[in-house]
Amino acid sequence: MSPRIGVMLSGRYRLHRLIATGGMGQVWEAVDSRLGRRVAVKVLKGEFSSDPEFIERFRAEARTTAMLNHPGIASVHDYGESHMDGEGRTAYLVMELVNGEPLNSVLKRTGRLSLRHALDMLEQTGRALQIAHAAGLVHRDVKPGNILITPTGQVKITDFGIAKAVDAAPVTQTGMVMGTAQYIAPEQALGHDATPASDVYSLGVIGYEVVSGKRPFTGDGALTVAMKHIKEPPPPLPADLPPNVRELIEITLVKNPGMRYPSGGLFAEAVAAVRAGHRPPRPNQTPSSGRASPTTIPSSTQARAAVACGTKTPAPRRSRPSTSGNRPPPARNTFSSGQRALLWAAGMLGALAIIIAVLIVINSYAGNEQHQPPTPTVTDTGTPPATKTLSGFPAAYCEYRVNWTNHKEISNSGLPKQAARAQLAGATDISPVAGQT
């Protein structure tokens, strides 16, 4: 039987008002009869109460969130399983009742946040996530609906319902996607393990939305949106935003998780630098592994691709001296003075042709570049700075896009089969009840 007003759970928590409903359960305002305080009680939906997997996930949420103690994380007070009107056991989670409003509701009213409030919210959220990341936990469903804003501007992260300990066995099936499509990291959309960098990506999507008033990726369905996170670059942010703010969001939304800020704390430090008027620091990037291939002369198409991605053509390898026995030196070719003159002229013409071709390529890209705002690129730590990208986004995106779009698990039909069957809309979406505040 579904919970209703007046129901008492375990002889202690009396349900008073339905606040919100979501994929896994309902959130109620309740009264703790022992301590005389108001609390929030998340009650698992009746259709899931007999499902051992959902019960275990619900217990995991209680254990996970109870480990975290920070002003920016809604506290967990209790967990229990109670008979409800003799209709079987129902699991519930007792949490801090936050006097606040979900960020998604704020955005529905205001469209976007002021830059000052947006950066403050992002820094607070990053610092709160760092507590989980330092404990080896990943939220995996960071989105505006899980960020509460109090009247004083304090951020409270809620709903660690699909959080997972990095070193523990996953509750979900291998390859199953957990998260909300509009804010999901590319690696999560592919069914790969989420990391703290996945939470940072989701927070970057939120950052894009709060400063621009729109999400970077939209579509007709969850799968369409998820595929855009995997394959497409975000649209350029409004030109009226400060360059360091645009750079911060662009760094955070690169496809390669190894090239993002690796934790909420480092993301928060980057936001703090931007708030102080500085450029965001570059994350410690994990360069792609691989052996260098033999040097070849690139075609004109390859050369243009290299310029667009901010890469440099590798220098030709020097020939190694032979270690074999002494060999007689090759016979010298002798040329007449006329032949030498012809060879010299041919060499000059060849060099001139190369110079002209290079100038044509440079001029063509310079013409294109005039219409795009200059954006500093992200480079690997310890390597020379990359050349400026022409897309307006860091070179890391252009470099890694090929790896993601050619991933062995991606087919022409889209996501992996298991991922496509998963509920990309999120298992723990929380939607306020109509008429409730």
Curated annotation (Swiss-Prot):
Residues 285-303 have a biased composition (Polar residues). One of its GO terms (cellular component) is plasma membrane. ATP binds at I19, A20, T21, G22, G23, M24, G25, Q26, V27, K42. It is a single-pass membrane protein. Residues 363-437 are extracellular. SMART domains: S_TKc (SM00220). Keywords: ATP-binding, Cell membrane, Kinase, Membrane, Nucleotide-binding, Phosphoprotein, Serine/threonine-protein kinase, Transferase, Transmembrane, Transmembrane helix. It holds the Pfam family Pkinase. The keyword Kinase applies. One of its GO terms (molecular function) is ATP binding. Residues 277-334 are annotated as: Disordered. It catalyses: L-seryl-[protein] + ATP = O-phospho-L-seryl-[protein] + ADP + H(+); L-threonyl-[protein] + ATP = O-phospho-L-threonyl-[protein] + ADP + H(+). Its EC number is 2.7.11.1. It is an enzyme of class 2 (transferase). Belongs to the protein kinase superfamily. Ser/Thr protein kinase family. Protein kinase that regulates many aspects of mycobacterial physiology. Is a key component of a signal transduction pathway that regulates cell growth, cell shape and cell division via phosphorylation of target proteins. This is Serine/threonine-protein kinase PknA. It comes from Mycobacterium leprae (strain TN). The gene is pknA.
